[in-house]
Every structure is written in C-alpha cells, then in structure tokens.
C-alpha cells in the first residue's frame, strides 16, 4: 500500500500515541475544534432555509447547537476530502477520491454521507464508485451505534466505542447484502481517527478466508467546518 495511504497498523500507531480523553465542557470542545480548523471556518453545506425545522450543518459555528450527547463525536463534524486505496474481491486494487460529510441538525445523532470515485494513475477521476449514507449515535456510556446503507446494495449495523478523544472504532454486528449486491462482502470493522496533522484517516477491514484484511483506507483533509 502506498505510504501516503492509511493502513490499519498506521492508524493504530498514531491514535494510540494520542493523549487519552480528558473531561471537556461543551464550550471547550467547540473552541478547540474551531481553533484547529480556521481555514475551513467560513464554509458550510448548502441549505434551503425554508423548512420549519433546522437545516443540516457541517460547521459548528453555524446552525443549531450540537446536541450535548454528541460531544464525544464532535471532532468528526465537517466535510472531509482526499484520496485512498482499495483492495476488494470484486474489483481488485485501485486508487479513489472520497468526500465524507458528518453533519447534524441539533438532534442527538450525526448524519453521514460518503461519495467515492475511482482515480487513474495520474489522479484524474475516471468513474463514480459507490456511495454510503447513514447515522451515527453514541450513548451516555460511550457506546457508538452506526447504521449504514451502500449504493451497491448493502445495509449494515455497527457498534463500537471511542478509543480516545481523537479515534473511534466500530465493528459490524449485521451485514445484509441484496441479491444484486457484493456477495463476497463479509463482516468487518472500521477505525476513524484524527492524525497528528489533523487530517481524518480511516480504514475498513473485512473478513476474508477467516482473517481480517484491509479493504479500503483513506486520508482526508477538512474542507468545511
């Protein structure tokens, strides 16, 4: 795997070296995030503004206040964009571009959307790969629940927990594939974490022949929030 990509072992090394969680008030957590990402502070995802309920926001400075129950997921909120590497049973190895959006509307969950497109050897987009959408929740006991659907015909439920205040690991409890979906997709786990440069790294591992193997990984920089 190219050195610029984020392997499972690399992510684990980075995140385990981070400072363990400390108690933060809601204001302290928001202020810390605001200081780290000044360059993307002026941008937000579009909203029509004419609904009787709050529009989604991916910028903690705009829209409704983040629900207090989501403070452990606060660093994820924003739009992230970058490149990654895939090694799948269906299509082999390839490079991809990706955009991930974590947004909220003031309620006690985050909305999640991922768009992935294939890249050629020169880094140019060649084809849309697939999309994911879903919701992230976390309990008062720091138990994470994630519900995801894939445009390829997959629905998954993940459970997990924060590893520290900058990393979150989830494992699939249920993976359902439609008749036209990727029949070889097995159960898996994911790790999302902020790297020392404050980029978001993530990796997806899947069960293949009785062992977990990296399937997709990427390093993304914040462009909104």
Swiss-Prot record:
Sequence intervals crossing the membrane: none
Q: Which Pfam families match?
A: THAP4_heme-bd
**Motif GXWXGXG located where?**
78-84
Q: Which InterPro entries match?
A: Calycin, Nb(III)_bact/plant, Nitrobindin, THAP4-like_heme-bd
Gene3D superfamilies xrefs = 2.40.128.20
Family annotation (SUPFAM superfamilies):
Lipocalins (SSF50814)
Family label:
Belongs to the nitrobindin family.
Provide the protein name.
Ferric nitrobindin-like protein
Q: Which organism is it from?
A: Corynebacterium diphtheriae (strain ATCC 700971 / NCTC 13129 / Biotype gravis)
Lineage at the top is: Bacteria, Bacillati, Actinomycetota, Actinomycetes, Mycobacteriales
């Amino acid at each position: 795997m190219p050195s610029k990509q984020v392997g499972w072992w690399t992510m684990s090394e980075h995140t385990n070296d981070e400072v363990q969680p400390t108690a933060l008030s809601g204001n302290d957590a928001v202020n810390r995030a605001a200081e780290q990402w000044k360059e993307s502070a002026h941008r937000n995802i579009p909203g029509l503004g004419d609904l009787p309920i709050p529009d989604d926001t991916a910028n903690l400075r705009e829209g409704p206040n983040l629900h207090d129950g989501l403070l452990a997921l606060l660093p994820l909120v924003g739009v992230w964009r970058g490149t990654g590497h895939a090694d799948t049973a269906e299509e082999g190895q390839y490079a991809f571009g990706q955009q991930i959006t974590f947004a909220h509307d003031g309620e006690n969950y985050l909305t999640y959307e991922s768009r992935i497109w294939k890249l050629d050897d020169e880094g140019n987009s060649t084809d849309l790969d697939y999309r994911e959408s879903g919701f992230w929740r976390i309990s008062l006991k720091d138990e994470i629940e994630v519900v995801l659907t894939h445009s390829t015909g997959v629905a998954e439920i993940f459970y997990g927990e924060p590893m520290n205040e900058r990393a979150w690991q989830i494992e699939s409890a249920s993976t359902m594939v439609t008749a036209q979906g990727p029949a070889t997709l097995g159960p898996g786990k994911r790790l999302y974490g902020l790297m020392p440069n404050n980029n978001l790294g993530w990796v997806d591992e899947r069960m293949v022949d009785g062992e977990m193997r990296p399937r997709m990984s990427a390093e993304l920089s914040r462009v909104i929030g």
